[in-house]
């Protein structure tokens, strides 16, 4: 069963509470995958102007803005969770140790602006205990993402410049 949930758009600064901020981030943490709809049209059907939140239509900028906010949110999760995980790992509890290892391994990736899913793709995290901990941490950028180009009726074939940029 596929269930789609429309979550209101994110704006620059969401990781610091701008726009829907934390509410947006808490909603997106609960989904299994992300379909990011990207505006790839200048005007609405009939030529009506639709103001873009950033003043101009630039799908690549929009993708980068959202991805940056999601990376920052995950980095904040690590900065909050890592000190606690390191303290808990001192007890030598295997789950606590695995959690600290996962957070330590993922932090540099996020600092290099790579999503958490790249840790899986690049084999940075392979240990089953670490994979379980990773799943439980709820990182947004660990989720698969699909970019969906929102085009106007004249560009359903995807030949327009804005679509091609995506």
Enumerate the predicted regions with their spans.
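Switch II of P-loop NTPase G domains
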Residues: 1-33, 41-67, 122-137, 162-163
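Conserved ASCE/P-loop NTPase catalytic core
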Residues: 1-19, 27, 67-71, 75-76, ...
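Conserved beta-strand/loop subsegment of P-loop NTPase cores
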Residues: 3, 31-39, 59-85, 102-118, ...
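A generic "cationic amphipathic patch" detector
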Residues: 37, 47-48, 91, 116
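A short, ordered amphipathic alpha-helix with a cationic face
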Residues: 52-53, 74, 156
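C-terminal-of-GTPase-core extension/linker across diverse P-loop GTPases
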Residues: 84-166
């Amino acid at each position: 069963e596929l269930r789609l949930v429309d979550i209101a758009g994110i704006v620059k600064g969401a990781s610091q509470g701008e726009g829907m901020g934390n509410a947006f981030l808490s909603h997106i943490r609960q989904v299994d995958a992300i379909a990011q709809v990207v505006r790839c049209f200048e005007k609405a059907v009939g030529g009506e102007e639709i103001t873009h939140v950033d003043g101009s239509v630039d799908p690549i900028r929009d993708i980068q803005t959202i991805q940056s906010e999601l990376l920052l949110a995950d980095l904040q999760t690590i900065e909050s969770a890592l000190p606690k995980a390191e303290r808990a790992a001192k007890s030598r509890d295997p789950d606590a140790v695995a959690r600290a290892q996962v957070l330590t391994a993922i932090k540099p990736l996020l600092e290099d602006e790579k999503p958490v899913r790249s840790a899986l793709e690049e084999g940075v995290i392979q240990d089953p205990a670490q994979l379980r901990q990773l799943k439980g941490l709820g990182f947004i950028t660990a989720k698969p993402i699909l970019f969906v180009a929102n085009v106007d009726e004249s560009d359903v074939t995807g030949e327009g410049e804005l679509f091609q940029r995506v």
